[in-house]
Amino acid sequence: MSDLSSAAWEQRYQTGDSPWDLGFPTPPFVNLLSSSEAPKTGRIAVLGCGGGSDALLFAEAGFEVVGFDFAQTAIDRANARANDRGIDSIQFLQRDIFDLETEFANGFDYILEHTCFCAIDPELRSRYVQLVHTILKPQGQLIAIFYTHGRSGGPPFGAKPQEILDYFEPQFDRILFKPVTDSIDRRKGDEYLAIFQVRK
């Protein structure tokens, strides 16, 4: 898939060609929330939220959640799941994430990243980092799973662990950065869990 437009992502959701959307929360986030490293509750943005599985996990854990996705079908699916579960502490909005900076500047305690950084054109990664910095509150945190596979092409576009650090460490402090050991089978060895905090 070389077309990364909103229409292309929408078509993939409409045709069911969305293997990144597991239909259940990713195990590393489930286990993080039950660990001693679990973040305190707050307002969290989920970028590229897809069908909302990870967003709903955090809502059920007491977070106030706003999920954003390029594709309206993904947003409709996420809203339906929230309604089915009776969750009202969550909102899903169809947006281009790069349009969020003005409306949501300093708007979130946390940002949740799972399959967004790997889905955008790698040339936009510096802009993504600046977006995250802008919409987080002072000392806000990015909670992320990054794809570190070495395969060419994408999406998902991989990134070496040091590349990820090089993008974020000029503006963020590293709280946690480690290989994921509880990935689903097809992602084993290809993921890093990170928590980066906006530097004072």
Predicted regions and their residues:
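Conserved acidic residues
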Residues: D109
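Short catalytic micro-motifs in class I SAM-dependent methyltransferases
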Residues: T115, A119
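Class I (Rossmann-like) S-adenosyl-L-methionine-dependent methyltransferase catalytic domain
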Residues: S2-A45, G50-F104, I120-K200
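A conserved beta-strand element that flanks and buttresses the S-adenosyl-L-methionine
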Residues: L112
